[in-house]
Amino acid sequence: MPGRLGGSRRAAIIAIGVLLGACPVQAQPAKPAPSRPNIVILLADDWGFSDVGSFGAEFATPHIDALAHAGMRFSNFHVAGSCSPSRAMLQTGVMNHRNGLGNMPETIPDEHRGKPGYDTVMNHRVVTIGELLQAAGYRTYLTGKWHLGSDAARLPHARGYDRAFSLADAGADNFEQRPIEGLYDKANWTENGKPATLPKDYYSSRFVVQRMIDYIGEGRASGKPFLASINFLANHIPVQAPDSDIARYSAMYRDGWTALREARAKRAAALGIVPAGAAMVTMPTTPDWRKLDADERAAAVRVMQAYAGMATAMDREVGRLVAHLKAAGDYDNTIFVFLSDNGAEPTNPFASLRNRLFLDLQYDLATANVGRRGSFSAIGPGWASAASSPLSGYKFSAAEGGLRVPLIIAWPGHADIRAGGITDGLAHVTDILPTLTELAGVAGHGGSWRGRAVEPITGRSLVPMLKGGAGSVHGDAPLGYELSGNAALFRGDYKLVRNLAPTGDGQWRLFNLKVDPGETRDLAAAEPDRYKRMLADYRTYAKANGVLDMPAGYTADEQINRYAFEQQGKPRLIRFGLWVGAFVLLVSGLIWGLRRRRRAKSGWALSRR
């Protein structure tokens, strides 16, 4: 697509820069340390803001919490509202409309397909952290969910990873090699670009950690430092966990999601993650726990127990990895980054009778089986509101519950990073790459890579914040965001936000996140000048990044349903129709044959008379 990076248009775009949210700021490489650090990225899937013990969760995450106490917690860290855009920004340090993920394959409207920035895969105009560190002499490994492209030229082994065992899809079963039924026809696991088969004792969190431990061990003789990116499937739909982990929480969650949301808010405030007494909204999509019947409550309690068990199972694997690195003598010289790709998942896959009937044919949906092998479950909007506590909204929306997630950065053997520190300065997922390259003493690409122009890194190094010397590296600079029509503009302590249906009404609202992280008090009328200025900033950002308006009537949920029908529903209907047609032809042929025989016999009998 030469128009984006060639000729006068390229010059104009880079001159504008990604003016608000994409201002090219290249970290200055630090002097190489005697021994360059290893880097471990722990990417959780669909974990809400308070889904970690050190951010307010009631379930056990002791190993992730240990990293938090060894490093720094970022309580004002933002990603995209859904997975692929966040993952591409994490990989490249480039905003999503410039890295190809202006939207995802499952949610893009037909009108946007093929437009600049709307590739629905990570494009080749960006450079990954794997490519940068690989070129600098690092061993580079990735295990788990990829979801940035499924063809050979876009899988991890072609994007800077020496070895990779990855899932190309948005999600899959956690106990067997099985896709999310109705969305994909198979679970597309590959190793180094070739189709791979999972072991019989597979459980997702255990497997992706063990495969990474194997990779690290097999490459140790080289003496090179390593980048280990572990992309967990937990806690994406389907929510599944080992029986023992579910049983651990058998006495919990009987008071419902509203009580849990309130309890988490109090814990988060006590931990210093949010201001004391921060107000919360009651989301209109949250069901009234008191109106559920006994069976509905039992099913809801069970799925949250499974969700908690799934998180604890993942945390245990983090602990196993850390123990391995300690035993190998690597722990003190390893930088750990823990984050989630977006907020908690609110989807209720059983909301429609059609989906319920389909899933009932594919899975064992009995309450006693929730979370186990052969089950399909999701926490829905009620528990998602608790997972996002005390924020408003969840995955897919541009509200804080969709964009703000836990971030932990630790380097246990490095005194410059404040152990146990918490910062509420604004940080963004594009900031991770320049942070890690600076800490590793690796130069960035400066917009040119192997003789060709590429998108400049738009994130800013968080090293000043890690050292305790800056409130936010973004200062008062505008930082823009858009996905599926849901949009935001951050500037200092303030946020301008718009959510389309079904999570919003399409109106812009203004909030001071410093004192109101729950987005409860719209300041648009009280601060009209700031509102107008930030709206102008957003429009500049949208124009500079090629953001397209959504078609009338668009909703991400409906688009996902269309995608599922096109990918699975229509082919299944066609196959069913062919089967029925073949059956009808067969029966018709048999009937015709029988009638012909009868006629033949009748004719023979008449001829004998």
Labelled PLM ranges:
Residues 152-160, 240-241, 323-411, 418, ...:
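Histidine-centered active-site microenvironments of extracellular/periplasmic hydrolases
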Residues 32-38, 90, 150-174, 205-281, ...:
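Active-site regions of oxyanion-processing enzymes, predominantly non-cytosolic
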Residues 162-163, 167-172, 373-403, 410, ...:
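C-terminal cap/loop subdomain of S1 sulfatases and analogous C-terminal strand-loop tails that border
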Residues 49-141, 159-163, 169, 173-174, ...:
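Active-site segment of extracytoplasmic enzymes that catalyze sulfate/phosphate-ester chemistry
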